[in-house]
């Protein structure tokens, strides 16, 4: 099989991994000799974000879509009638270097089906990363999907060459995993996550000690100490969870995510809406969950990580606000923070001149940057309602929930039982503009 055929198959097979997003652009060919900038030959290119916030292009492929596992929800499971392909280590390395030199990509995202054994598959992935780093002195970004059943030594080696590692938790519950992916063991997955976490923590401590030594040492000692640093997966570890394949509630999903963040020091939990596949198990749903559910989970995840919200606060059911759907599910009509505000109207209005940053972050429409701007602005004067707009914030969403030095008639909306409809209509009207 030609290399381009392999790339087409294995790039397409990698699209189900949510750990980095595709560019969404339409490829434009330059085969007729006209135009510049074509990446039509660079299939498998996706966008992702580095820890410092930069958006980069990655070559996103599977090493192989052959697999010995029979995961019901996976298009690449052993019994799936899909076209199969497999790269060699050299082919992935050469593709990465070639695309990098053409300025198509800035890094590699590499995953794989399981072939022969977990250790054998992991050895192939590690070999790709090692070859790139050692032989070609590749200094771009590398994200490796690690195999949970692989030996601790291979997991350790992977982190020496990769910027980020990830192990998929797959499904929100043990029961679902046993039903749909019987070869995968939740205990083994968590054990491997602990191995990665411990190495990452060790690396952080090593870098801290190295910085202290360097700052108090002479130049000759500094060089030796720098080379002795233990650097392991500097961008941390992440995981992915399929939603909508089972009956797990959003509360259960977010509780698991919160546990992954606190116990395993996850840098990111990705949510991937289940996509029905041909010849799948009868127990699996025939339709995908609404895409907005995936979006709401990401919003709720953000509230957990950066806004000081608790899972119970985000997912608490209230018939007065969300009288449709089962308990423990996020409101699909409005974002999670607005849903919380509508359930807790006694918390409002918040005085923007006296509220702490933590309280400001609870106001719908005020994010971390907006809260900082408000706090900075009120050092110089008492803020009026319209001063919030001068901070670059949408006053229409915020004004029912705040009070300022001047009168704010919009606060009366808090007493309106149909306040939720006010926001739904406003969002719908805005969407019709595009």
Residue spans of the language-model regions?
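Canonical Radical SAM [4Fe-4S] cluster-binding loop centered on the CxxxCxxC motif
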Residues: 61-90
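Short Fe-S-cluster ligation motifs
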Residues: 97-111, 300
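C-terminal extensions
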Residues: 325-361, 385-434
């Amino acid at each position: 099989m030609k290399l381009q055929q392999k790339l087409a198959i294995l790039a397409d097979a990698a699209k189900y991994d949510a750990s980095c997003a595709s560019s969404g652009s339409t490829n434009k060919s330059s085969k007729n000799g006209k135009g510049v900038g074509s990446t039509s030959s660079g299939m498998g290119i996706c966008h992702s974000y580095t820890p410092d916030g930069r958006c980069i292009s990655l070559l996103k492929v599977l090493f192989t879509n052959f697999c010995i596992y029979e995961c019901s929800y996976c298009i690449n499971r052993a019994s799936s009638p899909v076209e199969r392909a497999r790269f060699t280590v050299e082919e992935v390395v050469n593709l990465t270097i070639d695309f990098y030199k053409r300025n198509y990509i800035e890094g590699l995202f590499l995953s794989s089906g399981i072939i022969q054994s977990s250790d054998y598959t992991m050895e192939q992935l590690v070999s790709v990363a090692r070859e790139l780093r050692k032989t070609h002195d590749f200094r771009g970004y590398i994200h490796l999907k690690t195999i949970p059943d692989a030996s601790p030594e291979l997991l350790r080696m992977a982190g020496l060459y990769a910027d980020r590692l990830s192990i998929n938790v797959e499904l929100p519950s043990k029961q679902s995993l046993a039903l749909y992916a019987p070869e995968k063991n939740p205990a083994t997955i968590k054990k491997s996550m602990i191995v990665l976490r411990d190495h990452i923590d060790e690396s952080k401590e090593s870098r801290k000690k190295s910085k202290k030594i360097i700052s108090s040492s002479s130049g000759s000692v500094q060089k030796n100490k720098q080379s002795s640093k233990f650097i392991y997966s500097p961008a941390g570890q992440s995981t992915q969870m399929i939603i909508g394949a089972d009956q797990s509630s959003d509360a259960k999903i977010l509780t698991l995510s919160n546990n992954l963040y606190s116990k395993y020091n996850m840098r990111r939990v990705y949510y991937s809406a289940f996509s029905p596949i041909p010849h799948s198990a009868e127990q699996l749903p025939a339709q995908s969950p609404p895409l907005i559910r995936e979006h709401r989970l990401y919003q709720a995840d953000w509230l957990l990580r950066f806004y000081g919200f608790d899972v119970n606060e985000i997912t608490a059911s209230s018939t007065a606000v969300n009288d449709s759907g089962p308990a423990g599910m996020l409101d699909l009509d409005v974002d999670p923070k607005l849903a919380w505000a509508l359930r807790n109207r006694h918390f409002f209005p918040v005085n923007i001149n006296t509220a702490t940053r933590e309280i400001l972050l609870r106001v719908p429409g005020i994010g971390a940057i907006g809260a900082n701007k408000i706090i900075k602005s009120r050092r110089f004067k008492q803020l009026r309602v319209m001063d919030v707009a001068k901070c670059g914030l949408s006053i229409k969403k915020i004004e029912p929930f705040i009070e300022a030095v001047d009168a704010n008639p919009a606060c009366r909306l808090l007493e309106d039982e149909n306040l939720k409809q006010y926001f739904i209509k406003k969002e719908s009207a805005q969407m019709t503009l595009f």
